[in-house]
Amino acid sequence: PHIEIEEITEPDLDAQLTADDLALGLERFGPLKFKVLAYRALQRIVKAGALGTEIRLSGKLPSSRARTWRFSQGYLKKTGDSAKVVDRAQARAQTKPGTVGVKVSILRPDAKLKDKIEVNDELIQKLKANSEEKIEIKQPKKNKK
């Protein structure tokens, strides 16, 4: 079999690496430091240039009752055709109270969003030229008495 290996140029923008790193941190430092770990990971992702990110931690984190914690920042598409460009990953952390699920979603800075419209000076000039050509002044009709 032929295997190709590529270097990950920006590890903070890779969802699987971030999820695995977060799961490893939860196993190492315990479930009480989960907020610190999640916010640090969130800041690293945003500092790397992501348009938006979301981290979900599910399980027995601060107590014996299971709960889902959601940390998000920026713009992130969840549904529709544009949601296909979002990088998603899952990981599991085995902590003393129980298993914790880690889900990471990252919208990369180079993602092509179909609903995003960029307006530059050239487009503005074309619109102005088109609007000037089509404007016709109509004289109001005079009523005959």
Regions found by a protein language model. Give the residues of each.
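RNA-contacting regions in translation and RNA-metabolism proteins
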Residues: 1-145
